[in-house]
């Protein structure tokens, strides 16, 4: 099966992007200056990522709110139209996190549900199952991923540089969602991101994506790829599906119980998750820091007193801190300051538990 292409694929290739497969898409890993330079540009300036591989399921209709309440872990009553919310879709049987999702509540009866790259069909299927289980309920849930590009502008200078392109886009506050217009194109802009920095994500029609990209980069915003996005999200302590979330991993194990609201009523997987809450988790996600430039790596064993007690889910060298950082599943009694060892290809790295984020 051929990987899908971003509406900006030709633009990326024309400026020297290194293209890699990711979640069924061909996407830029980095550009000519490389991942390290792009990472630093985001921490100290502003970058733009093409994140068009994020799915968009547009859910509309008078029953849309009720269906999403039954589908996802968080409580939409806590926000309102014009706001965004982080949430999870769980497996019905074991409460594993099928996907972690941002919902943009665009209008009173319009929601853009934003799954990860490869999970759009699973999310759509789950919504269909929930509609079938609810009497007299109808919604319209359409995959509009291919109709638009999504550009994430992130960094401490993101808003100041964005304001030279469009002041309205630059003014969308954190976790706000607004419909805007740019050069005749209808946009949806949200104050969301995945870097630990301030910024916005812009959904733009595919027909106008290249023009908006050019306007942003001409304003001094640096193109950045998936490599920098991963090191940035790790420094920020943010989970990545397939690493810190996925099959066999629950919201509670991942330390994301704040995105779960048991008091709102039943949701998909709520019984299984409540049972885990009541009996106690068997492991928990924690941050680890190491000395030196050698980074911990995904899959590395974590040892305490010579005994394997956990596993690294994501690890890398932190450009900002100058040493290794990792997220790992550890015993539930692990506390900040506890000492462990990480086995990296036969070499043991001393590691200390910290509370993420590592930076910021």
Annotate each predicted stretch with a short phrase.
Residues 80-97, 170-183:
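Conserved alpha/beta core surface patches that mediate binding of polyanionic ligands
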Residues 65-69, 86, 100, 110, ...:
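Generic internal hydrophobic packing segments that stabilize the cores of diverse globular domains
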Residues 1-89, 96, 227:
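Acidic, proline/glycine-enriched N-terminal capping motif
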Residues 70, 78-80, 89-96, 101-107, ...:
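Short, charge-rich binding segments
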Residues 50, 100, 201:
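Acidic active-site catalytic centers that drive phospho-/nucleotidyl reactions
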Residues 1-23, 27-31, 106-360:
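Conserved, structured C-terminal
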Residues 38, 94-95, 242, 260:
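Alpha-helix boundary/capping detector
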């Amino acid at each position: 099966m051929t990987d899908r292409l971003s509406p900006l694929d030709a633009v990326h290739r024309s400026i020297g992007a290194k293209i890699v497969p990711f979640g069924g898409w061909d996407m830029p890993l980095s550009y000519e200056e490389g991942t390290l330079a792009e990472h630093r540009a985001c921490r100290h300036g502003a970058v733009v990522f093409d994140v068009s591989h994020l799915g968009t399921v547009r859910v509309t209709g008078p029953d849309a709110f009720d269906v999403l309440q039954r589908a996802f872990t968080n409580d939409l009553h806590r926000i309102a139209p014009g706001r965004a919310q982080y949430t999870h879709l769980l497996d019905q049987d074991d409460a594993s996190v099928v996907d972690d999702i941002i919902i943009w509540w665009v209008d009173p009866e319009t929601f853009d549900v934003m799954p990860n790259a490869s999970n759009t069909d699973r999310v759509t299927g789950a919504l269909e199952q929930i509609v079938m289980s609810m009497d007299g309920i109808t919604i319209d849930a359409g995959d509009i991923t291919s109709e638009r590009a999504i550009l994430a502008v992130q960094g401490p200078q993101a808003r100041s540089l964005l304001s030279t392109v469009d002041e309205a886009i630059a003014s969308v506050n954190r976790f706000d969602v607004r419909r805007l217009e740019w050069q005749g194109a209808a946009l949806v802009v949200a104050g969301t991101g995945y870097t630990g920095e301030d910024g916005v994500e812009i959904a733009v029609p595919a027909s106008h994506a290249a023009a908006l990209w050019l306007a942003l980069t001409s304003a001094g915003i640096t193109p950045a790829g998936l490599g920098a996005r991963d090191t940035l999200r790790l420094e920020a302590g943010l989970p990545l599906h397939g690493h810190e979330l996925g099959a066999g991993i629950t919201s509670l194990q991942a330390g994301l119980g704040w995105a779960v609201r048991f008091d709102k009523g039943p949701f998909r997987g709520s019984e299984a998750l409540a049972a885990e809450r009541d009996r106690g988790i068997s492991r928990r996600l924690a941050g680890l820091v190491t000395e030196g430039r050698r980074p911990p790596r995904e899959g590395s064993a974590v040892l305490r007193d010579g005994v394997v007690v956990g596993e690294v889910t994501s690890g890398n060298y932190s450009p900002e801190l100058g040493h290794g950082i990792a997220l790992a599943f550890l015993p539930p009694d692990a506390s900040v300051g506890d000492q462990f060892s990480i086995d990296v290809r036969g070499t043991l790295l001393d590691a200390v538990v910290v509370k993420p984020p590592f930076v910021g």
